[in-house]
A protein has these predicted regions:
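ABC ATPase NBD coupling module
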Residues: 28-33, 84-100, 124-129, 243-247
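Conserved ABC ATPase signature
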Residues: 152-156, 160
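Helix-to-loop junction immediately C-terminal to a conserved catalytic motif
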Residues: 67
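A short, surface-exposed alpha-helical micro-motif characterized by mixed small hydrophobic
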Residues: 219-221
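ABC ATPase "signature
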Residues: 237-238, 246
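A short, proline-enriched helix->beta-strand linker immediately N-terminal to the Walker B motif
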Residues: 171-175
């Protein structure tokens, strides 16, 4: 079935969406507003890429530039190597048909059945009746709503409505699917179901999925690439794993703090130190779980003792990452070796206190 409903496979450039030094400005009564400022990014064909930012970061403008609803003030946006801004509206229509989109509020026609909602873009594209019926049947099966074909949207749950939205967005076999805050109105369990379906869209159909979100949990669950926007600037481009393991911007670090266990604050540090009076507390940030395990194995051979006294772990696209606080004790030289080992695997490994490291005769038991 996946082969039947996938986009047509013709040779295409591997860089599916490219922003080249894109700036977008809007004129207002109070002056010029710069929505995007010199943004350059590349979204690979067949990837799941997330664009994350707070309200006003420029996410919506970026989406409208991808589907050609806005043109850059300067720079270029290339989709499949084509600069939409150089085309007439007529020339852009077939290219826009290659981009599907789903929304936070579903945007379904309440007076139409689920079948007719999915049929809508096919009718606009003048599909033959037999082909239209076959396509809708395939899509409703793919999203798990075959039994709901003749229901109306008000008979469906939020998650089911978003599944209809996905089926409709895929109707004309687009090679790109834009998901604009598509899970923001859903509960966590339903969000997970929708994200799982988007993964299938990508894996089984080969569709390039671009997720626009303000939720780091969505990025963690689905993204291979991530672009972090702040006040119109691209502050963190790269793979999702890079962003989680080695966040370069304060914005990314704040987003990460919402989903991964943070290091102890001052009061918690004081409590942990009082519970481990002879230990040196070391924070280890954004470390891969397997690397952390290897580091602890090496520390066990230094003569230092260790105990994990605080921490949290998250699963990301291709592994797991964690923040930990480790209590180290033993001979001073051994503890220094242990700190160096932790620094090798950590984005940031540093003592949280200036506690005196005990000598061998003082060592805690």
């Amino acid at each position: 079935m996946a082969t039947d409903i996938a986009p047509s496979s013709t040779p295409q450039c591997p860089d599916h969406i490219v922003f080249e030094h894109v700036t977008k400005e809007f004129g207002t009564r109070s002056g010029t507003v710069q929505a995007l400022d010199d943004v350059s990014l590349t979204i690979k064909r067949g990837s799941i890429s997330a664009v994350i930012g707070h309200s006003g970061a420029g996410k919506s403008t970026l989406v409208r530039l991808i589907n050609g609803l806005e043109t850059p003030t300067s720079g270029r946006v290339l989709v499949d190597g084509t600069d939409f801004s150089q085309l007439s509206d007529k020339a852009m229509r077939p290219l826009r048909a290659d981009i599907g989109m789903i929304f936070q509020q579903f945007n379904l026609f309440g007076s139409r059945t689920i079948y007719d909602n999915v049929a809508y873009p096919l009718k606009l594209a003048h599909w033959k009746k037999a082909d239209e019926k076959k396509r809708i049947t395939e899509l409703l099966s793919f999203v798990g709503l075959t039994s709901k074909a003749w229901d109306h949207p008000d008979q469906l749950s939020g998650g089911q409505k978003q599944r209809v939205g996905i089926a409709r967005a895929l109707a004309t076999k687009p090679s790109i699917l834009l998901a604009d805050e598509s899970t923001s109105a859903l509960d966590p369990e339903t969000t997970a179901d929708v994200l799982s379906l988007l993964k299938r869209v990508n894996a089984e159909l080969g569709v390039t999925v671009v997720v626009i979100t303000h939720e780091m949990e969505v990025v963690r669950s689905i993204a291979q690439q991530v672009s972090v926007l702040a006040a119109g600037h691209l502050v963190e481009p790269g793979t999702a794993r890079q962003a989680f393991a080695h966040p370069q911007s304060e914005t990314t670090q704040r987003f990460l703090a919402t989903i991964i266990g943070q290091h102890p604050n001052g009061e918690e540090q004081a409590r942990l130190q009082s519970e481990n009076p002879h230990a040196r507390l070391v924070d280890v940030s954004s470390v891969a779980s397997h690397s952390f395990g290897d580091a602890l194995a090496r520390i066990s051979h230094t003569g230092a003792s260790f105990q994990i006294v605080h921490g949290g772990v998250i699963e990301v696209h291709d592994g797991s990452l964690g923040n930990y606080t480790v209590a180290l004790s033993g001979p001073a030289q051994a503890v220094e070796q242990a700190v160096q080992i932790l620094e090798e695997v950590s984005n940031s490994a540093a003592p949280t206190t200036s506690a005196t490291v005990p000598t061998p005769t003082e060592e805690a038991h």
